């Protein structure tokens, strides 16, 4: 409900609908940690730095993206953007069928395990490769204040044999002149 005001505001400008739930690999209910001072850091997972950083907990329903796509009769192809503070693979595990009709996935990927139970960089890359996706581009990075090390990046994944990888040349002959 914390975000519902913003969702309603968006729907005044654009047509669509929303579902107040956490995307996950299973349908059910989970504990969700709300960070009142930085809502974008709210997560299903606990912070590695301790309970003071976890904020307060609420119960939220969970849905599978596959069920949402089926129930809403959404038309393919899909572009999926997931930024859920370390629970990205759980979201994608609930979208196994939808992934087959998806050409582009944008994921926030951490280079450190900031959240308990979060996958590391390699696990995300391997999961995506196992599901037929490869890295296409790496977008903005976020550096951790602790030591200025690269902490997170947004990675664009595309189908390995999809429309964005039909041509493997570096450049055309004209571009190299």
PLM feature spans:
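Phosphate/nucleotide-binding beta-alpha loop and adjacent structural elements of enzyme active sites
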Residues: 1-177
